[in-house]
Every structure is written in structure tokens, then in C-alpha cells.
């Protein structure tokens, strides 16, 4: 029984497929059958998308033309034909000048045509509302300002490390952090540097009035190095310039002369007392020298750097003084040493006047107690 269409319909249906499956069923369909179908579907989708875009474009209602637009519609075509090399912006400038040059009588027909188009537009679209394609400039500026503020704010996940590197926790990077020089860091990074340097000073115990005198002797010897001159200027009390320079020069002379004095007489109690006295006095910038040693430093108070002859003479005088102090009675030397700081500073201590050196209170303890008491009253002056 033959088909009613004579087999044309079956041939049309099998055009997308090859005839090999009919003759050789084991080979299956041809490889180019599915790509052809997929290409056809893609074309259909593109056609549908273009139809939708056209529908949207047609759905958009255009505004009615004004008189200038009605006149420029034909005039722009004429100018474009006469000047094919000119840009559209140049054509618009020429059209604007030509429109302004027209008289009211010449503009009247275009104005009437624009009014007719406006009335027709109102009749065709009674509920028309103008919707501009471009947003207003004010909204754009506001959005730019808010975006700028968000960019200016630091991210919450940004953490500044102690070594001055910025780590972003939100980004999962497969490589390690790279170190950058401090010059490339942002401005805000240097505010964290004091916190990074603070742990270096945790090991030092700063002397306070509540600490005992023995803590000064047991402290780290590295802390009692030669102090900078800024500490002497930042002390709460102040003397005249000559007295301060006298103390600083005396401190430098004592530091240079102490090793020589130790080499000449080892094991002397006088040298031991002077060695114990030098450490806290050098730190606080106050020199408690005996009257004889202070007398030799007075002529050098006004000089910034004494000549080498004066240093040699002072060194020889100091060696002679050490020899003389070794021959002085021990109790007499302790008596002058314990009260020399009070007499020089001009302060009266009622609580320390009655202290008498005994077997327990040796020269070291008396020197340390006098030094700690003087430092306490100098750092905390009475109102």
C-alpha cells in the first residue's frame, strides 16, 4: 500500500539524517546529524531574541518632535549629502547656527507641524509619561560619592601585621606573603610602629619610687649605659646651664678614669664604693662627686670640649686623689660620702638624718639608699 503523499513527506523528514542506518543498522546515525539540529536550534533562538529586541524597541514610545527637529530632519540629510566628510557633531553645529538665523516667518510652518504632532501624540498615547534613557546627573554623582566613601573605608578583613605588612584574610592566595619596603606602605601604617617596638622594652624594669634600692644594683647592666643628653633635659627639675654641663662632663671623666683606678688598686673598699655609686648616677644624669673632685671640674664648666692638656692634668690629679683616699680612714670617708648629695642639692631630709652606718648598713647600702632617695625627690618635686 503506497503512501498518500507518494513518499515525499518521508523524504523530507529524513533529509536531516543520512541513509546509512537504513542499509547498515550496526553503524548507527551519522555524526553530523546532531550538529545540524543544534545549529538549527541556535538560529531559531537568535531569531526569537532579535524579535524580542525589536518588540522592546517598538514598545518604547518616542517623544513628539519639536519645531527644530522637524526642520533639521530634512536639512541634516541635505547637509550630509553636500558634506560627506563632516562629522555628525559638526553637522549639528551648522544646523544650530542655520536655525537661529531663520526668521519667525520662516520658522512658522515648522512650529505648526510640531504642534500638530504633539496633539496627535496626546491622542494616541493619553497615559504617556516621559522616561529618559539616561539617568539624571545628580543620581550619578551621589552614586559616585557613595562608591568613593566605600573605597576610602578600610576593609574589615585587612589586618596590619607587626612587621608592617598588610594581610587580606578574605583572599585565599596560594602563595606566601611578599615583603614590601616601608616606603610603599600606606600612610596609616606608621601609626602601628610604636606598638611593634614596644615589646623590645618589656625586659627592662624602669625604676620607680616604690622599688627598693637593691633593685637598682640587680638590674640589667646594659640598661645603665651612658645616658643620652635628652633625658637630662626632660627631667622635671632644672638647674642652670653651667651646673648641668658640669655634671655631664664629670660623668664622662668618671667613666674614662674608672678602669685606670681599678688597675692601680684592686680590692680597695673605696674603689668598690665608687664603682657601685657610678651606675645609678650615670642613668639619672646626676653626679654625686666629693667636694675635692667637684672643685677640679668647676673651671671646665663653660667649655664644650676641654683641651687634651687639661684632660691629662685632670687624669693625673684623679690618680693622686685615689691614692689619698686610700689612705683616709674608712669611717671618715663614709661620713662625708653619705651626706655629700644632700649638701650639694640643698635639700633637707628629716627621715635620713639619724642614720648611722653600722655593720649591717655598709658603704654599698648607704650609697644606694642616698641615690634612691635623691632620685625620688628629684623626679617628684613638691607642689
Swiss-Prot record:
Region (Disordered): 1-20, 37-58
Record-annotated Sox C-terminal domain positions: 267-382
GO BP terms in the entry: determination of heart left/right asymmetry; determination of pancreatic left/right asymmetry; endoderm development; gastrulation; Kupffer's vesicle development; positive regulation of DNA-templated transcription; positive regulation of transcription by RNA polymerase II; primitive hemopoiesis
Cellular localisation: Nucleus
UniProt GO cellular component terms: nucleus
Tissue expression remark: Expressed throughout the deep and superficial endoderm during gastrulation. During neural and early tail bud stages, expression declines significantly in the anterior endoderm, except in the endoderm behind the cement gland. Strong expression persists in the endoderm posterior to the liver diverticulum until late tail bud stage. By late tailbud, expression is undetectable in most of the endoderm but is maintained in the presumptive gall bladder region and the extreme posterior region. In addition, expressed in endothelial cells in the head and along the flank of the embryo.
A single MF term (Gene Ontology): beta-catenin binding
Chain positions covered by the region annotation Required for transcriptional activity and interaction with ctnnb1: 332-337
Keywords for this protein: Activator, Developmental protein, DNA-binding, Gastrulation, Nucleus, Transcription, Transcription regulation, Wnt signaling pathway
Chain span(s) of sequence motif 9aaTAD: 331-339
Domain free text: The 9aaTAD motif is a transactivation domain present in a large number of yeast and animal transcription factors.
Subunit structure: Interacts (via C-terminus) with ctnnb1/beta-catenin (via Armadillo repeats); this interaction is required for inhibition of wnt-signaling.
The protein's name: Transcription factor Sox-17-alpha
Species this chain originates from: Xenopus tropicalis
Gene expressing this chain: sox17a
Amino acid at each position: 500500500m503506497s503512501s498518500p503523499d507518494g513518499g515525499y513527506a518521508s523524504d523530507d523528514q529524513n533529509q536531516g539524517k543520512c541513509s546509512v542506518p537504513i542499509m547498515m543498522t550496526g553503524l548507527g546515525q551519522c555524526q553530523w546529524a546532531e550538529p545540524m539540529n543544534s545549529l538549527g536550534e541556535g538560529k531559531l533562538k537568535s531569531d526569537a531574541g532579535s524579535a524580542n529586541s525589536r518588540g522592546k524597541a517598538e514598545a518604547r514610545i518616542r517623544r513628539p518632535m519639536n519645531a527644530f527637529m522637524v526642520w533639521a530632519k530634512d536639512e541634516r540629510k541635505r547637509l550630509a549629502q553636500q558634506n560627506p566628510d563632516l562629522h555628525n557633531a559638526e553637522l549639528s553645529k551648522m544646523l544650530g547656527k542655520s536655525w537661529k538665523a531663520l526668521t519667525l516667518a520662516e520658522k512658522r510652518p515648522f512650529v505648526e507641524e510640531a504642534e500638530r504632532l504633539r496633539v496627535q501624540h496626546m491622542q494616541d498615547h493619553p497615559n504617556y509619561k516621559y522616561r529618559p534613557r539616561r539617568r539624571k546627573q545628580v543620581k550619578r554623582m551621589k552614586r559616585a560619592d557613595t562608591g568613593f566613601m566605600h573605597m576610602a573605608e578600610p576593609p574589615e578583613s585587612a589586618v596590619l601585621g607587626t612587621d608592617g605588612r598588610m594581610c587580606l584574610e578574605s583572599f585565599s592566595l596560594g602563595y606566601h606573603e611578599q615583603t614590601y619596603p616601608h616606603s610603599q606602605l600606606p600612610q596609616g601604617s606608621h601609626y602601628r610602629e610604636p606598638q611593634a617596638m614596644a615589646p623590645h622594652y618589656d625586659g627592662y624594669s624602669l625604676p620607680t619610687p616604690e622599688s627598693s634600692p637593691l633593685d637598682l644594683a640587680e638590674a640589667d647592666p646594659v640598661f645603665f649605659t651612658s645616658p643620652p643628653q635628652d633625658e637630662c633635659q626632660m627631667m622635671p627639675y632644672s638647674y642652670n646651664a653651667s651646673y648641668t654641663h658640669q655634671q655631664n662632663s664629670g660623668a664622662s671623666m668618671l667613666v674614662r678614669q674608672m678602669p685606670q683606678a681599678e688597675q692601680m688598686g684592686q680590692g680597695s673598699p673605696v674603689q668598690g664604693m665608687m664603682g657601685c655609686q657610678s651606675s645609678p648616677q650615670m642613668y639619672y644624669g646626676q653626679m654625686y662627686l666629693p667636694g675635692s673632685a667637684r672643685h677640679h671640674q668647676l673651671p671646665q664648666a663653660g667649655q664644650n670640649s676641654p683641651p687634651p692638656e687639661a684632660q691629662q692634668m685632670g687624669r693625673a690629679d684623679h690618680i693622686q686623689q685615689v691614692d689619698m683616699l686610700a689612705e683616709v680612714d674608712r669611717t671618715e670617708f663614709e661620713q662625708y660620702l653619705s651626706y655629700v648629695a644632700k649638701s650639694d642639692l640643698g635639700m633637707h631630709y628629716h627621715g635620713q638624718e639619724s642614720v648611722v652606718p653600722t655593720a649591717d648598713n655598709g658603704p654599698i647600702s648607704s650609697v644606694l639608699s642616698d641615690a634612691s632617695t635623691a632620685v625620688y625627690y628629684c623626679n617628684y618635686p613638691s607642689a
